[in-house]
Amino acid sequence: MSSYANHQALAGLTLGKSTDYRDTYDASLLQGVPRSLNRDPLGLKADNLPFHGADIWTLYELSWLNAKGLPQVAVGHVELDYTSVNLIESKSFKLYLNSFNQTSFNNWDEVLKTLERDLSTCAQGKVSVALYRLDELEGQPIGHFNGTCIDDQDITIDNYEFTTDYLENATCGEKVVEETLVSHLLKSNCLITHQPDWGSIQIQYRGRQIDREKLLRYLVSFRHHNEFHEQCVERIFNDLLRFCQPEKLSVYARYTRRGGLDINPWRSNSDFVPSTTRLVRQ
């Protein structure tokens, strides 16, 4: 269990509780979770973070009424900056989006500006939103993470409790390499409900070569770990930076959809540009 799982800041969340669904606009449904909850135990301070990045959300179940009462549908793309005070709790985000369902807006731009305003207020940080008509995305190919997949290893694993022990002495030789490694075996659990979260992860770095078996064992050790998506990515970035000491590092995870939302956090200390094309499980 994470050291802050019972923190008072989490007590008021609707997550894990029975809730009523509202279909008229209500910004108060949004709930934030302080990023400091997981950053403080990692020694990460808001004024001296070792990374930049964003939490990228895809909104698949977004609908409202136009001025004449005709339902509208869109796919939304949201980017929440890493410097925001809070991350957005996903169940509250879903409930908030449902409140648009029977609400009339004059035009698409009003919807976009409403989303940006409410999300930035909840997160206490910078948020950008884009809305896409379905015909803009139809025929979009399924993407893939560029890099070498490390999953097909003939190894025995019998421990699924989170530990950084696998990263001890996990670099080999003195030669500096630059490579991108990918795993589709990332599985963690919701901090509150302990429901499984499934993801693919891309790790791009420059530095002494990281032992792929040790890295895979470390990633698999998240299997019983309870944290939100964004927190897991920051933990992985921090652990790799601490133990492997690469010159450059980027960590990007794309998680499968739940409640019409997928969350795709990335953190980097280089000029990394994340691909936003959905993966095969998304």
UniProtKB/Swiss-Prot annotation:
Alphabetically ordered keywords of this record: Cytoplasm, NADP, Oxidoreductase, Queuosine biosynthesis
Compartment list: Cytoplasm
EC number: 1.7.1.13
Group of enzyme by EC: oxidoreductase
GO biological process: queuosine biosynthetic process; tRNA modification
Binding site for substrate: 88-90, 229-230
Catalytic activity field: 7-aminomethyl-7-carbaguanine + 2 NADP(+) = 7-cyano-7-deazaguanine + 2 NADPH + 3 H(+)
Pfam families referenced in this protein's UniProt entry, alphabetically: QueF (PF14489), QueF_N (PF14819)
InterPro entries noted in UniProt: GTP-CH-I_C/QueF, NADPH_dep_7-cyano-7-deazaG_red, QueF, QueF_N, QueF_type2
UniProt GO MF annotations: preQ1 synthase activity
Catalytic residues of the enzyme: 190 (thioimide intermediate), 197 (proton donor)
Oligomer status and interactors: Homodimer.
Family: Belongs to the GTP cyclohydrolase I family. QueF type 2 subfamily.
Function statement: Catalyzes the NADPH-dependent reduction of 7-cyano-7-deazaguanine (preQ0) to 7-aminomethyl-7-deazaguanine (preQ1).
NCBIfam families cross-referenced by the UniProt entry: QueF
Protein name: NADPH-dependent 7-cyano-7-deazaguanine reductase
Originating organism: Shigella dysenteriae serotype 1 (strain Sd197)
Gene field: queF
